[in-house]
Swiss-Prot record:
One of its GO terms (biological process) is store-operated calcium entry. It comes from Drosophila melanogaster. The gene is Stim. Pfam families: SAM_2, SOAR. Residues 41-70 have a biased composition (Polar residues). Ca(2+) binds at residues 155, 157, 159, 161, 166. Keywords: Calcium, Calcium transport, Cell membrane, Coiled coil, Glycoprotein, Ion transport, Membrane, Metal-binding, Phosphoprotein, Signal, Transmembrane, Transmembrane helix, Transport. Residues 313-570 are cytoplasmic. Residues 1-23 form the signal peptide. Its main location: membrane. Changing residue 166 to A/Q: Increases Ca(2+) influx through activation of CRAC channels and arrests cell growth. Plays a role in mediating Ca(2+) influx following depletion of intracellular Ca(2+) stores. This is Stromal interaction molecule homolog. Changing residue 157 to A/N: Increases Ca(2+) influx through activation of CRAC channels and arrests cell growth. The keyword Coiled coil applies.
Amino acid sequence: MRKNTIWNYSLIFFCCVLKSISTLDHGPHTVSVDSNRHNTQHQYKQNPNVASQRHSSHESGQSLHNSQSEHVTHIAASHAGSGGEHSTHLAQNLHRSSYNLLSEAMSQAVSNEFSSMGSGSADGACAADDFDCYSGSVQDRFGMEAIASLHRQLDDDDNGNIDLSESDDFLREELKYDSGYEKRQKAFHFNDDMHISVKELWEAWLRSEVHNWTIEQTTDWLAQSVQLPQYVDLFKLHKVTGAALPRLAVNNLQYVGNVLGIKDPIHKQKISLKAMDVVLFGPPRETGTRWKDYILVTLLLSAIIGCWYAYQQNKNAKRHLRRMAQDMEGLQRAEQSLQEMQKELERARMEQENVATEKLDLERRLKEAPTLSSSNSDLEVQQLKKEIEMLRNELSRAEFELVDNCWSPPPQLQSWLQYTYELESKNHQKKRTSAEKQLQSAREACEKLRKKRSSLVGAFVSTHGKSIDDVDRSIVEARNALGDVTNELQERLHRWKQIETCLGLNIVNNNGLPYLENVLYGRNGGLQSSMGMSSTKGSRARITNSTEDLDDESIQGKLNFENFSLLATE
């Protein structure tokens, strides 16, 4: 501010002297002064280093004032030599006009000084095209010089302005933008200003968001946009803010190399280009790195979720396989128990048939006893007598029991009950066959599933398919069918045991379903009568034995079915 004041005073006084000289003489002296003034201003414009040599004191300004006064006095003396009265009159007029002009100039300078201080203008009394004066009045002189250097770098035709084609060439050639730079170029040419001067570029830089960046924002830009995070600590150490980016943009060797200590030329060039971009065209554009990071994170999360889902499905499949294996083992045990029980039932039935056959043979032999020849041995006669005695005793006991009960079943009831038992046995056999088929199909499905699980593709398909659920459901259905067959067989044994106990008839041991159908529906009276007679005669003799056999069979069957039920429920 003090330098501006000195130069204002000097220029005003110099103008006053020129005006005074012009009033005295309009000859060659005026042309000489004007040419000297033009040469001085032209020298200031051509030599930008003059701005750095303007650190003069108030005494240098005063000496310049004295030298100019002596020059004016010398001119007045030269004119005074031309003679007498006219010289005295000119000297008085010169003294009076110089004093008036000097007073007016001083008052105008003071008013301009106060007006420039009040308005806060950055360039004060500098001319619009006087960059040296303008850079000398700003605080960030290095930043201003860097902005001017960038302006010269963009101004290809050296006309003092940056037009649209020059900025377009700079974006394409220097910053290597192939596309997507229209917004940044539009932001550079603010308000469609197609000709940008140094002053406008400096004012745009002062308004820029990048100019107000803090140290943290600058280091973030260095790490993310420039991708040189190794210099973050160095920037923090030297407190590099956004205002220092123009010096980085012009690749100031003193600042970048000596102050910051960055020696790698490739890194210097990279920092310079990125700094040019943000200084001239604003904050860096989105390069898509963040979106790539989002997509990468999303894909990573999807992969993790997919792996977790596959792991869960594999674990569930293994758990289903273990459960199916357990169910199959339970079904196998139930099947074995059922087969053993069926074998025991068949064995008991064969024993009952053998007993009945022996009884019939004994009765036949008793009937044929009178016709035996006397040649039979005494031993056989004794045995027959013993058997006859036993039969008589049992017959008498049965008659006694019938007399005590005072009720005897009808003759045909035994045949109908035997026929009913055979029908139930036939239906039970059908259900058992169906349950065995379900068991066999479940076993085959389980084997197929195990074969599929042996390969990777089959394991993936079986994991994501419905085959496991279908096999599991078929196993459960087979187990339920076996349970129903077991319960029904247990209930039948108990029920027919109670019926035989109450009636004293042999129902379980019979001559078979075809014979019973022939007897009951064939209308053969002889067979029916003989069946009735044999039943009345033999029933009393077989009541005790059949009851005891049914007791043993029911107890054994009950134990077997209890074991089978426990295996089936497992």
